[in-house]
């Protein structure tokens, strides 16, 4: 089946793969930023030691990413006339938005909240049990 799509692929100097799919006559734009980290990725190496996290940590952290500097990112996207969501599979985590409005500000927001490291500020008490007592937990508080 031929969908007659104009697809451009490029790998940036930092390794990020960019895929642009142009669909003529479509009014809506969708942007997705994904990482090859998912539910199966529960081991983390810190200072030469392997820390094994409980399953569910990737999905939990996906939800925590929606809080940027104390604000709910969903509200920030809504103010830009966008809908947003995310998913975590066994092998990847992705964040995306769609809009019929201008894409420059929401694209910058997507890149800012996914790329920029910051300390997580919202860790509910029950989820603290997911983290071992280590410097990792201190970084997440």
Predicted segment positions?
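Acidic/histidine-enriched segments that form metal/cofactor-coordinating
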Residues: 35, 64-141
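His/Glu-rich zincin catalytic helix
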Residues: 1-73
């Amino acid at each position: 089946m031929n969908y007659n799509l104009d697809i451009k692929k490029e790998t940036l100097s930092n390794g990020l793969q960019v895929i642009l799919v142009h669909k003529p006559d479509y009014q809506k734009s969708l942007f997705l930023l994904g990482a090859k980290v998912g539910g199966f990725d529960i081991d983390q190496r810190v200072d030469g030691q392997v820390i094994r996290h409980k399953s569910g940590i990737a999905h939990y952290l996906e939800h925590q990413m929606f809080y940027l500097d104390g604000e709910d990112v969903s509200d920030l996207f809504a103010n830009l006339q966008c809908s947003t969501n995310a998913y975590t599979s066994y092998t990847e985590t992705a964040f995306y938005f769609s809009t019929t409005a201008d894409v420059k500000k929401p694209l910058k927001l997507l890149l800012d909240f996914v790329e920029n490291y910051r300390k997580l500020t919202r860790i509910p008490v029950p989820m603290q049990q997911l983290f071992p007592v280590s410097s990792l937990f201190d970084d997440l508080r």
